[in-house]
A protein has these predicted regions:
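A conserved active-site cap/scaffold subdomain adjacent to cofactor or substrate pockets
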Residues: 265-299, 306-309, 313-360, 369-403
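General beta-strand structural signal in soluble alpha/beta enzymes
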Residues: 19-23, 45-46, 66-70, 77, ...
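FAD-binding subdomain of flavoenzyme oxidoreductases
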Residues: 125-280
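Conserved glycine-rich FAD pyrophosphate-binding loop
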Residues: 33-35, 39-41, 64, 69-71, ...
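Glycine-rich N-terminal segment of FAD-binding domains in flavoprotein oxidoreductases
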Residues: 23-26, 30-97, 111, 131-134
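Glycine-/small-residue-rich beta-strand-loop submotif within the FAD-binding core of flavoenzymes
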Residues: 81-116, 155-159, 177-178, 260-264
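Short, conserved secondary-structure transition motifs
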Residues: 142-149, 301-317, 423-425, 522-535
Length: 562
């Protein structure tokens, strides 16, 4: 009855149509993008920041667990409920609150909690500027604030994790009181209602900006990533340097708005495709470019031959779709696909039907990889997709020409189409592994996906697993952001193998190597938070009412059972 009363209150604030109840109506919000599932009384979809504040006040008064959710594209279950809680739980979906304000001709932006990277990219285009992340998460509708809350990384070498010290957020205090904090550096008023009404209705480009030395991006990262002799990783989720209020909060605060730097578009860019059978070649390329070039790469993506093979076959439809229609249709496509899967997967004969259909359709299409990429795929085990910009293009051309003059590896400057397809093939890699799992579910127990950061001075970066682990795997799929030494490993595990056991063995190996994990997907409910990260979560959410249980911490009120 108490929960029913709360639902009625929510309906009065946001309207009946924006409060979803019942298992079927709420399932797609309670189920994670890759994995994860939990209970929720309802899903609430406020349309303004003031409505969000009013909903939060009801939640606090009713002692409810709150799961904040935007695009629900998290890969480690941190965007959804996790099983059962000791209190009732609600999901607050912020996608209706998607306003973006441009400051100083687009040099900075203020983003509301439902704004997406795709929309931000579009709004910045006339100003010849870019958001923190491009091509990748933006293609599946990821939110700007979700990236900030999880210190999301990405492929762009110069930018580091998504970070800001300028935000407006709500916090539940030790005494269980809800308070609003305005640290965004804009004069918006003094009380919560006035501040939020200002954010909801005011043109922020005309609002007085307070003098502040607070950062709106990780502007130190380019120096950090260049230090190739440091014995620590360049970036990872538990890095104390990037845990500040909204940044890294992982839903333990309710973020109403964040102020972020944007980046000028490069005048020119060029992709170089590198292939080799010798790991030390890529090691020397990375160390030389980072430490000696005047211009840092735009990106440098590593792919092992095995993941290229898998992606060419099982990620082909994704590459085709983006190549033909662009990225703008992908969020709608994925939303439609997920809605169909949610309904049909309950019927055994229709399980994974959309993946099976898409796979068959892709087979009818001719090979999409350009000939020279295919030649390198057959010839070389290790591949690097290096994108340089402006003066760095000439630097890379001269260096690579000299570097491979006496080595068996090789490189070539890509045409526009070759570079585009190479990058799209890398983007499709993670989805290709999941497609493989769904098509061969009788043989596959699960995909164990690990993202981790190696030390910057690691020369022995390629993994060789012990035989007793290797024999439990169908495929080992290796790719990553090579210059940042952030690696993504997808292990296709044989049927019948205990996933938690093999994961524990893998993490022990990473510990021995001095790696940090996760690097950029955050702990969610799949990784244990390191002590400093756990302390950060507890300090900003002392009652454990917001996203309880992440980092494998207690789900109980006040962390009672830890």
């Amino acid at each position: 009855m108490e929960n029913e009363a709360s639902v009625v209150q929510f309906q009065k604030v946001v309207g009946t149509r924006y409060v979803l109840t019942g298992e079927r109506n709420t399932e797609r919000f309670r189920k994670g993008y890759r994995s994860g599932f939990g209970e929720a009384i309802c899903v609430i979809k406020p349309g303004t920041l003031l409505e969000l504040w009013q909903v939060l006040k009801i939640c606090v008064a009713s002692d409810l667990v709150v799961i904040m959710q935007a695009a629900n594209t998290g890969l480690t279950e941190g965007s959804t409920p996790n099983g059962h809680y000791d209190r009732g739980a609600v999901i607050i979906s912020t996608l209706r609150i998607d306003t973006i304000h441009l400051l100083d001709n687009g040099k900075q932006v203020v983003c509301m909690p439902g704004s997406t990277l795709y929309d931000l990219e579009n709004q910045l285009r006339p100003y010849e500027r870019q958001p923190h992340s491009v091509l990748g998460s933006s293609c599946i509708g990821a939110s700007v604030i979700g990236g900030v809350c999880n210190n999301s990384g990405g492929s762009l070498v110069e930018r580091g994790p998504s970070y800001t010290e300028l935000s407006v957020f709500a916090q539940i205090t030790e005494n269980g009181e809800l308070q609003l904090v305005n640290n965004i550096g804009l004069e918006l008023g003094s009380d919560p209602e006035t501040i939020l009404k200002s954010l909801d209705t005011t043109d922020l480009s005309s609002v007085n900006q307070q003098q502040t030395d607070k950062k709106a991006s990780d502007n130190e990262y380019s120096k950090i990533v260049r230090d190739v002799d440091a014995d620590t990783p360049a970036r990872y989720n538990a890095d104390q340097r990037c845990l500040h209020e909204a940044s890294g909060c992982a839903g333990k605060l309710v973020v109403f708005a964040a102020r972020l730097d944007t980046y000028p578009k490069n005048e020119s860019e060029k992709v170089f495709y590198i292939g080799t059978n010798h790991l030390e070649d890529l090691t020397e390329i990375r160390r030389t470019i980072l430490s000696e070039f005047n211009t840092l790469p735009v990106s440098g993506e590593y792919m092992h031959r095995d993941i290229i093979d898998i992606t060419e076959k099982y990620g082909k439809d994704t590459v085709l779709m983006i190549n033909m229609f662009g990225t703008q249709r992908l969020p709608t496509f994925f939303a439609l696909k997920n809605a169909i899967d949610t309904r049909l997967n309950k019927i055994k004969i229709f399980s994974n039907i959309t993946d099976k259909l898409l796979q068959q359709l892709a087979k009818l299409w001719p090979n999409i990889l350009p000939n020279q990429l295919r030649e390198y795929q057959n010839k070389y085990e290790h591949h690097l997709i290096l994108k340089m910009h402006d003066e760095g293009i000439d630097e890379a051309n001269k260096f690579l020409d000299h570097f491979f003059s006496d080595r068996t590896g090789d490189y070539f400057p890509c045409s526009e189409n070759e570079g585009k397809i190479a990058e799209l093939n890398r983007f499709a890699a993670a989805g290709a592994a999941i497609r493989y799992q769904k098509l061969y579910s009788k043989d596959v127990e699960d995909i164990l996906a690990l993202d981790f950061a190696l030390r910057r001075n690691d020369r022995d970066w390629f993994e060789v697993l012990p035989a007793d682990i290797d024999e439990k795997l169908i495929h080992k799929l290796y790719y990553g952001h090579f210059f940042c030494h952030v690696m993504h490993h997808d292990y296709v595990v044989k049927k019948g193998v205990d996933i938690e056991t093999i994961k524990s063995e893998m993490l022990e190996i990473l510990d021995e190597r001095g790696a940090e994990y996760p690097a950029e997907h955050n702990v969610g409910h799949l990784y244990a938070a390191k002590p400093n990260l756990a302390d950060f979560y507890k300090s900003i959410d002392p009652t454990n009412s917001l996203n309880p249980g992440i980092g494998k911490l207690s789900k109980s009120k006040h962390y009672a059972d830890t």
